[in-house]
Amino acid sequence: MKYLKFFFIFIIATTLGICAHFALPRTAPTKLPPSYAKSSVLLVPLDSRPVCSSLPQKLGQLAGLNVILPPKAYLDNYKTPANKEKILQWLQINKKYYPYSIISADMLLFGSLLEARQRIATPAEETALLGKLATLTKSQDEKPVTIFSVIPRLLVSDELLPDRWYAYQLLRYSEYHDLVRITGSFALTQKMRQTEKKIPPEVLQKYISQYQQSDRFNLGLLALAKKTPNTKLTFGQDDASPFGLPHASAQKIKAAIYSKKLQNKAQLTYGADEIVALLIARCFLQQADWQPKIYLAYASTQTEQSVMPYMATTTANALANQLALLGAQQVAAPENADIVCYINCGTDKNPPGKNQAQEVQKLLEAGYKVAIIDSSEDYEPQQLLLPQLLKYNVSINRLTAYAGWNTFSNSSGTALAQAVIFAARLRQLQQTGADSKEIIALYAQNLNFTLERILEDYYYQKTIHPALRQQLIAFGNDPTKLDETEKQAAQNYIQSKLALNAFTLLHTNLGRTPFYSDGSKEYYITSLAVSSSLPWNRVFEVDLDVWTSVGMK
């Protein structure tokens, strides 16, 4: 009986300890006003994936912009291309009603990014689309339009057979071809010819033709922009490297921009999926008539000049390019900045740790608006900054922005877009003497967006997705070709894991400190709910939403 008594005391003490560990501060529920759109943007997305459709819409909501997409029935669904004709008709009908349009040329030419990687458009198709775009922009020339087009990526599509069997040889050929173009080296020419012999002629010709077709069409877009005063262009260099046929295409576009004197109307950037986020942010900054000042803080001395996977340039060059696209200004000191952008490019040899976490916490405590770009060389969680922020109890609820998905440019473009939109919207509210509840609501709305990125970019992409993929393969299922039963089982698994992650995040970090204080009152996140689904019959991406409640103390 004596030992039983001590056992019950131990159980009760342990239970109380766990409850105390997960307990949140006591607060009074607070109802915040909803946000309303002040303007609208018409968007023809790159494809229907959430990062190209719902993410831009959520960024638009943060900016007070209603981002309007074509009907879902018109859009692509994984391997089924979009109904291009229906989308073009929708655009022709609706464009005149909205002040600004962002149009993916790849969607209108191919029906999706995936289709653009697998099919080569004919000259007749290009000419027809350019003609329709010319009519569209001329007939509504008082309404600004930005058209964006993506240069084919370096690696051949995994969906193409037998092409993907020669992916490595095609990559090497592409790099040698570009280096020979630049240097004229006889030795490199010999290596290029040796590599060429290892590739079937029809496979090589198809690969080269992709870039020839892209060059031809993009030069046509430049000619179109030359004739239409309110048409701007953005060209993206998708999944590339410092040398290769994509780099050669980018150089052709750059030369054409200068020769046609279109520097104020056309830009080249590094990436694809994040382009719309940057363009929406640029649109809002132009409406707000504001140029934000950005200070770039690197997690290590190696970060600035590192070339991350699938990037055609260094992190410093990529960031300078995106700041120019936004119309933002880089400054040399944090005290002169509206936003401090903290950049991690973790590697096995140089992972982030306690020092980096403390640097971020000091910036937050000093009152800076801190946006984090969290990238990793091998897409491994131990190379990311976020786990270190959680380990050392950094107040992640005070971050202005966070992104850590896929490539470096995907992450940097998303984080920069969120940060400048939030800072510009806050500035607007403060200048117009908005009610304090509106400012608190903006902070809460921005935190919602940040939490979606944390739950998706870190918890799903870096922890749940790899484990789920391995399980599917172990049971003989293809993670890229799920049937409906497999998809539902995968969704149930993902939802249960994300719900647990959200609960843990709320009770161990997010809800324990205020996300906003006005000097007399503090505001806390008191609940965090998450819902998720697979947009396509594969596990590569997830469609994710979060809901939070706010309490006042």
Where are these regions (language model features)?
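Hydrophobic membrane-insertion alpha-helices, especially the h-region
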Residues: 8-21
